[in-house]
Amino acid sequence: MRNIDINNRGLGAPGVASQGVSHHITLENLYIHGVGDSQQTVGIAANSAPTWNWTIRNNQIIGAGTGMYLGNSDGNAPFVAGLIEHNLIRDTIGYSMQIKHQTVWSSVPAGMPTGTTTTVVRHNVFSKLSSFVSADGARPNLLVGDQPPSGPGSGNGFEIYGNFFWQNPTEALFQGEGNIAFHHNLMVNASGPAVVIQRHYGSVRNVRIFANTIVARDNGISVTGGQSGTTQRVAGNAVFAANPVSISGADAAQIDNVTGSQAAAATYLNNPGAALGQLDLYPRVGQLQAPALNTSGLSAYADWNRDFNGTGDSWTTRGAYAGTGTNPGWQPQLAIKP
């Protein structure tokens, strides 16, 4: 499905919804609006049955109740091996996007991959700057849930990178559990926390949070509740918040992050406190420089060595960018990232 203007005129129906098992679906260049009559109204929904190999690309979802709702609240409609890239999701009441947790797969439809797969979320813009502020809308911009605790799909995971997270008046920008690689993202939240890794309906498993640039009022990166036998690592980030990095657990560790208060971001970044249009999270000349980060194990992840702009990362600059001075790439804004 491509190149369609979808306006539901506030009548309570989703913009796009799958019915039954579906796979190898592409949704591209859609403009979805008029789906904001309540938090329960969704821009793109895949929550009725197992779905796999969906591509959701270059779409705009404006003012929805929930931008994307992938999987179901009971964990029995797994969303598997998806690619979600270059979308703009803004001004939702609830989540910009949620990928639900999964219970043990009671049955596997023909053709559904049972080996290890990854859902990739990259180069999207998630903004709740103008979201309606109420208890009903207190949701993160992006939330991802755990994989099945055992059996097929239990080794699956998420790779989330190159995204721009902008503001949330009531919640964190990102909340996750399961197996997660989270890298080279830009995050600004003047009203609350940025990254929260904690148990939701499943478990916190192997988590890698590296090379992100974060400016937030409260917690920058918080990691708790790691499952026994798994590891959580926070490395090479530039985090400016009241509590920049907080981790707990015997197998959780942080290393080689540059941290400071929210106000200190102005010492390291070109213009971190500005409004969109002037916002510039690129490092000032000579700032955030450090010896090369130990990247052992990171090459398993897609584009692990590409910064927010897609430039090769030499790992001597902390945060989401690989250089200092003048940003040669896309300036963060509420538009589809090229």
What do these predicted ranges mean?
Residues 6, 46, 70, 99, ...:
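Extracellular beta-strand solenoids
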Residues 3-5, 12-15, 38-45, 67-69, ...:
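Structural detector of coil-to-beta-strand junctions
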Residues 1-25, 29-39, 77, 97, ...:
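Extracellular polysaccharide-degrading/modifying enzymes targeting complex plant/algal/animal polysaccharides
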Residues 153, 201-202, 298-300:
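Short, small/polar residue-rich loop motifs at catalytic or cofactor-binding pockets
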Residues 171, 196-203, 222-228:
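Short, contiguous acidic/charged loop-to-helix segments that flank catalytic cores in large enzymes
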Residues 2-3, 19-36, 51-65, 78-98, ...:
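Right-handed parallel beta-helix
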Residues 252-254, 263, 269-338:
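Surface beta-loop-beta hairpin patches that serve as ligand-binding interfaces in beta-rich domains
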Residues 74:
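Surface loop/turn signatures of beta-propeller and other carbohydrate-active proteins
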